[in-house]
Amino acid sequence: MKKRLTESQFQEAIQGLEVGQQTIEIARGVLVDGKPQATFATSLGLTRGAVSQAVHRVWAAFEDKNLPEGYARVTAVLPEHQAYIVRKWEADAKKKQETKR
């Protein structure tokens, strides 16, 4: 699935995000305009990883601002058996959200 945003979603995502103008231009080109990341790597002389990171920063900001109501994002370091359970909960929650759409 290609990650895409509308211009208004993009503007909401970058609101308050501390990134440079180049990052914003790259992310808009990829997420809003649908241009391939390779285009920016070539034209700006950047590595693919740098371009991917720019896009990821904006996408992650969008996801953080658009969690379903009643949901929270968590990061934790757990023993493997507990991490397995949490991953299972995450998969179940994703399925539940997909059926609501």
UniProtKB/Swiss-Prot annotation:
Residues 37-56 bind DNA. Keywords: DNA-binding, Plasmid, Repressor, Transcription, Transcription regulation. InterPro entries: Fimbrial_Adhesin_Reg, TrfB. One of its GO terms (molecular function) is DNA binding. This is TrfB transcriptional repressor protein. In conjunction with KorB, inhibits the transcription of kilA, trfA and korAB operons. In conjunction with KorC is responsible for the negative control of kilC and kilE operons. Gene3D superfamilies: 1.10.10.2690. The keyword Transcription regulation applies. Pfam families: KORA. It comes from Escherichia coli.
